[in-house]
Amino acid sequence: MIYLDNAATTKTAPEVVEAMLPYFTEFYGNASTVYDFAANSKAAIAKARQQIADVIGAKKEEIYFTAGGSESDNWALKATFEAYKNKGNHIITTKIEHHAILHTCEYLEKERGAKVTYLDVDENGFIDLDELQKAITPETILISVM
């Protein structure tokens, strides 16, 4: 079988399954609760957060976990817009982004007053860097191009 939908769901690597197995079978407590059974889950998440922060040079408080890419895209765009809206309201993206980006940009346009520029791409999916440069204004607060 040839599987061509890895952008949506990718087979889990065997070493990841092995590392996660204890959390599927023994330590499956809700890490957000206060009872003792959840302590192992909470500790594992805290350790993972610190490890990721160390690898990328961030603070552990800057590491967030979401349910997946769409939620992450949605959260990143909305949070960035809200955090920087006092500096501008312009977002740049492309016409071929994932729907999580496009739908969130549409929401920000309609409901939050964002101005969004949707760049064209060439036959290979690349943007023209000159067009990107021309699209940037003093009001630009976010560029989201995958």
Annotate each language-model stretch with its function:
Residues 1-146:
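Pyridoxal 5′-phosphate
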